[in-house]
Amino acid sequence: MQYDVIIIGAGIVGLTLAIGLAKQSLKVVLVDAGKQPKQPKPIKGDKAPVFNARVSAISSASEALLKDLDVWDKIARMQPYTHMHVWDTDGFGEIAFDTHSVPTMGTPKLALGHIIENEVINAALFEQLTHYANADCYFNAKASDLHTNESGASLLIEPNKAEAFHASAKLLVGADGANSKVRSSFGFTHTFWDYDHHGIVANVSTQYAHGNTARQAFTPFGPLAFLPLSDPHQSSIVFSQQSNQAAKLMDLNDAEFEKALQVAINNHYGSVTLNTPRVDFPLRMRYANKWTCKHVAIIGDAAHTIHPLAGQGANLGISDVLTLLDIVAKHKDSLGEVGMLRKYERCRKAEAMKVIATMEGFKRLFDGEQAFKKLIRNVGLLGANKLPGVKAFFIAQAMG
């Protein structure tokens, strides 16, 4: 089967790219080993919704692209956050800002961003993609025998309970995550380091309403974020902790863990109750040294993974999509050729490295209990809250 573009990986980044390319009238096939996304079930009566623990903080730039692709209005539920509060639990530094702090060009900002479950975004994206007759999707499918020649890229697609077939295209895009098969198949080496931290995620109910506020507390062992969900008394938590401390937290029973959250967040929410099981995962940085070769490109987490400190992983991937869509639109006659792909690589590699360096600097500053580090970060937060230029930098990071 002949296509213009083959995409492996149907997460937020892969689905967004597929819609954008289909909108440009290109013939696209999307292949993923996972299940087909489904919209969440409607809430019946007064029953509180059950949220998935994996969420993204979607920036205004990402929102703009999703609106342009007619996806935004299909997202079943989301929570705008209008305030952000960051502080050091063991010091005096803090920074707080809201939509009124954001410089605008005449149009007031209604939100700093939106907290949305990843599976809800994926469901909306897939629903929109099904409107395009020039886009094929295969879920529960295996992709193998990836290779290129002078005319394009090809692979074997093995759908679940269907006959395998070969597909070829001028461009193959790997949107297949941190352990990318596309990246490894074409020998794209990557820089890697382990943060020696684990992220613990869960959804919680709280005694006090979140007030549309995202809060992040820097504890002695790592940051804790409470991200507001569309139920006023529910939040998604991300607790990034040194690996040994994370293991201790995972060993606590639910009541003990809930109390630990309440203390770590300075009792801003009153009592805290777990709604979902805790899930932990190692935090690692990856940065591909090469992103493209003739007829092949990688994108999103396949090209870069960053510390979740500022929740910018999804936005960084969507920015990759925006750049690639723009370059494809201008170079359809040379789709998949080295020149056009290098333009994408040069632009996005530089931006990704800048974000990685910024997040790494924050991570190192807020990790550890040395007296000098504590003084610098507390003075830094205090100064950021007082100085407009520095505060604007923090706001820009929060808004992606």
Residue ranges and their predicted role:
Residues 22-54:
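Glycine-rich FAD pyrophosphate-binding loop
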Residues 326-400:
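C-terminal helical "tail/cap" subdomain of flavin- and related membrane-associated enzymes
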Residues 3-30:
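N-terminal Rossmann-like FAD-binding beta1-loop-alpha1 element of flavoenzymes
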Residues 245-338:
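FAD/FMN-dependent oxidoreductases across multiple families
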Residues 68, 77-185, 193-198:
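Conserved N-terminal helical subregion
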Residues 66, 160-166, 171-278, 288:
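Conserved FAD-binding catalytic core of PHBH/FMO-like flavoproteins
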Residues 13, 36, 179:
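Conserved Rossmann-like nucleotide-cofactor binding loop
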Residues 48-89:
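N-terminal FAD cofactor-binding segment of flavoenzymes
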